Amino acid sequence: MSGFTFKQFHINQNSCAMKVSTDGILLGAWADVKHCKNILDMGSGTGLLALMLAQRTEENCQIQAVELDPIAAKQAQENINNSVWKNRIQLIQTDIQHFLQTTAQTFDLIVANPPYFEQGIACKNEERELARYTKQSHLNWLEWAATRLSENGRISFVLPYDAGKTLIKSTALFCIKQTNVITKIGKTPQRMLLTFAKQPQVLMQDQLVIYDADNQYTEAFIELTKDFYLKF
C-alpha cells in the first residue's frame, strides 16, 4: 500500500519499512491529550502518531517526532509538510536515546508504538528489521521516556498483550490506564494500550473489541476512530 488517506491528512508510506497499522491508529486516537503543550513521538515512522495528535490538540501544542531511519524520516517530513499542522510538528532524524539525553525539553505526553519482536530471523530489508525488531527492551524505552517527562506528564504505549503485562510489573512508574484490545468478540486480548505516570492514580481498566460476532466494527471502535477513518 503506497498511501493511506484519513479525514484530515494523507500518509505516503512507500519508502517506510513499517506501514500504517491499526495499532498505531488506536494509540493515536486513544492517548489522553488533555492539557498537553509539548508532545514527543518516539520512533515516528511515517509520522502517523504526530499527525493524529496534532489533529486532536490545540494550536498552542507543539509536537516533536523522532525517527532514526533517514529514509522513513524523509517521508515523514513530507507527510508533515503536506498537512495543515506543519508549523506545529518538528521532525528530528536521530536515535531516540541520544535525543532524550541531549534535549532540555520536558513533555506532557510521550507516545510510542515501539518495535514488538525480539531479535530473530533477519529480515531481507534492513529498514524493516530495524522497525520490526527491538534490540532494546520495552522497559528501556519506558525508562528513557521517563527522563524527559514533566511532573504530571503521561507516557502511552501500544504493545502485545503479554509484553504489556510484563512492562507493568517491571517499571517503577505507575500504570494509570490500561485498555486490552481484542480483535474479535470471544477472542483473547492481543494488544494492550497503556498509560504510565510518575504520580500514583486510580488505575482505569477496560477493553476494546474491534469486530463483533458478525465481523462488523463495534460501536466502541467506530466511536474511538471516527475522526480519522474515512469509512466512519
UniProtKB/Swiss-Prot annotation:
EC number from the UniProt entry: 2.1.1.223
InterPro entries linked: DNA_methylase_N6_adenine_CS (IPR002052), SAM-dependent_MTases_sf (IPR029063), Small_mtfrase_dom (IPR007848), tRNA_Adenine-N(6)_MTase (IPR050210), tRNA_adenine-N6_MeTrfase (IPR022882)
On whether Coiled coil is a keyword of this UniProt record, the answer is no
The entry's function note states:
Specifically methylates the adenine in position 37 of tRNA(1)(Val) (anticodon cmo5UAC).
- Reaction it catalyzes: adenosine(37) in tRNA1(Val) + S-adenosyl-L-methionine = N(6)-methyladenosine(37) in tRNA1(Val) + S-adenosyl-L-homocysteine + H(+)
- Family designation: Belongs to the methyltransferase superfamily. tRNA (adenine-N(6)-)-methyltransferase family.
Recorded hits in CDD domains, A to Z, give:
AdoMet_MTases
Which SUPFAM superfamilies has this protein been placed in? S-adenosyl-L-methionine-dependent methyltransferases (SSF53335)
Entry protein name: tRNA1(Val) (adenine(37)-N6)-methyltransferase
In which broad location class does this protein mainly occur, judging by the first location in its UniProt entry? Answer: cytoplasm
Species annotation: Haemophilus influenzae (strain PittEE)
List the PANTHER family: TRNA1(VAL) (ADENINE(37)-N6)-METHYLTRANSFERASE
Keyword Lyase on entry: no
Top-level EC class, please?
A: transferase
Query: May I have one GO cellular component term?
Result: cytoplasm
Record GO biological process: methylation; tRNA processing
Per its record, what are the GO molecular function terms? nucleic acid binding; tRNA (adenine-N6)-methyltransferase activity
* HAMAP family, per database record: tRNA_methyltr_YfiC
Q: Which UniProt keywords apply?
A: Cytoplasm, Methyltransferase, S-adenosyl-L-methionine, Transferase, tRNA processing
Localisation? Cytoplasm
